[in-house]
A protein has these predicted regions:
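Metal-dependent catalytic neighborhoods of phosphoester/phosphodiester hydrolases
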Residues: 98-104
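Short N-terminal helix/helix-N-cap motif within the alpha/beta-hydrolase-1
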Residues: 97-98, 181
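Acidic/His-rich, metal-assisted hydrolase cores and their charged scaffolds
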Residues: 1-86, 105-169, 173-399
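Metallo-beta-lactamase
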Residues: 85-95
């Protein structure tokens, strides 16, 4: 799947000159004990990108670059990046696609099919710049073999496996929740990973939250009991633009009710192409007690207004805030110890449903892969945090 020459010509025409801003950046490959492999002589496309990058207003962090390749991962806000002629997007969350707009014209964007559809319908990125890749299929992109693997994060999220001509293999996890299933991925089970870019969102021993399956079972149980005792209850699940779908899908399936969401969310959900999803969505909130709201809306004053907007059809509300940040060491894996917060006729449960790996899962994933080097991609701004994470990695790999 090589870049078409016609696209390159189009990029050349659309390039705009920007004021050059020079910033010094430490060679962090050295800081992490890595050698930055000397890439092969750049092709004409790379040279063009390198010249444009001279005017880039921000320096791209080293952990977003794939050494020995003209690739970056989730680095759109830094575009144009010097010597980068292909930009990879791991998934459709704003902190990863920031910098992408409908005017994007720097270079092709490689992502999964589902993410590609979201780029088009939500950000209106020109289809000519979007290169969708099938999960589990190997592609030759500029001489590098690239494979997308399911990341067990949000819909469309991918681990990206890069295999260089010199035999080196790199894995970028993007955001992911490590699972036993990943140990059966042929690429991960049979090939040594030389360099692992690791999602370290919860790389701290205090984060040992339960499995997604256990949390879903808890949420369904609470909902069932609540509706049995209070039939006129509206059930609200907080969610991101994409993400947390399994929470409300589990409730819907267990209770046999449809899902109400606004038109924008319904459009996004339908774009996933999941079997039966369209038939399971309601366009009228009066037809079902299960409603989806932005997770940022789960505040009592906002929920009170929402309840009042239902014109008396419901007399109480049960809401779920599903995020790993609600996890408490005191509760651990005993979800029955969770105490909801209530105000008037509204009850909110914070449940540790996370789409990122907990500390134990990170350890198991690293010990399964046994990579030569690990580069953390989250919480790396503080040298103390970096040092702690490196000590964890060393302990795991010695075991």
């Amino acid at each position: 799947m090589e870049t078409k020459r016609s696209d390159v010509e189009e990029w050349k025409k659309k390039k705009k000159k920007r004021k050059r801003v020079t910033m010094k950046q430490k060679n962090l490959f050295e800081l992490w004990g890595l050698k930055d492999p000397h890439p092969k002589p750049p092709d004409p496309d790379d040279v063009q990108q390198s010249r444009a990058a001279a005017a880039s207003p921000l320096n791209c962090p080293f952990y977003k670059k794939i050494p020995g390749t003209p690739f970056t991962v989730d680095a759109f806000r830094y575009a144009p990046v010097k010597a980068c002629s292909a930009y990879f997007l791991t998934h459709f969350h704003a902190d990863h696609y920031i910098g992408l707009t409908k005017s994007w014209s720097h270079a092709p964007i490689y992502c999964t099919n589902l993410t590609a559809r979201l780029l088009n319908i939500s950000l209106y990125v020109a289809p000519s710049f979007i290169c969708p890749l099938e999960l589990g299929t190997e592609y030759n992109i500029k001489g590098i073999k690239v494979t997308m693997l399911d990341a067990n994060h949000c819909p469309g999220a991918a681990l990206i496996h890069f295999r260089l001509p010199n035999g080196q293999s790199y894995l970028h996890t993007g955001d992911f929740r490590a699972s036993k299933l990943m140990q059966s991925y042929p690429l991960l089970a049979t090939q040594r990973i030389n360099l692992l870019y690791l999602d370290t969102t919860y790389c701290n021993p205090k984060y040992r939250f339960p499995s997604k399956e256990d949390v879903l079972e808890f949420v369904v149980g609470v909902t069932r009991r609540y509706l049995n005792n209070h039939p006129k209850t509206i059930v609200v699940v907080g969610a991101y633009t994409i993400g947390k779908e399994q929470v409300y899908l589990a409730i819907s399936q267990a209770l046999g009710v449809k899902i109400y969401a606004n038109a924008s969310r319904r459009r996004i959900l339908r774009s996933f192409g999941w079997a039966g999803i369209s038939e399971n969505l309601s366009t009228n909130g009066k037809d079902t007690p299960l409603h989806i709201l932005p997770i940022s809306s789960l505040r009592f004053e906002v929920l009170q207004r929402y309840l009042e907007s239902q014109y008396g059809q419901y007399t109480s509300m049960l809401a779920f805030r599903p995020t790993g940040w609600t996890y408490s060491e005191t509760i651990g894996e005993n979800l029955n110890l969770i105490k909801p917060t209530s105000k008037g006729n509204i009850t909110i449960y914070g449940v540790p449903y996370s789409e990122h790996s907990n500390f134990t899962e990170l350890q198991e994933f690293v010990q399964f892969l046994r990579p030569e080097k690990i580069i953390p991609t989250v919480n790396v701004g503080n040298p103390v945090n970096r040092g702690k994470m490196q000590s964890y990695f060393q302990q795991w790999l010695k075991a």
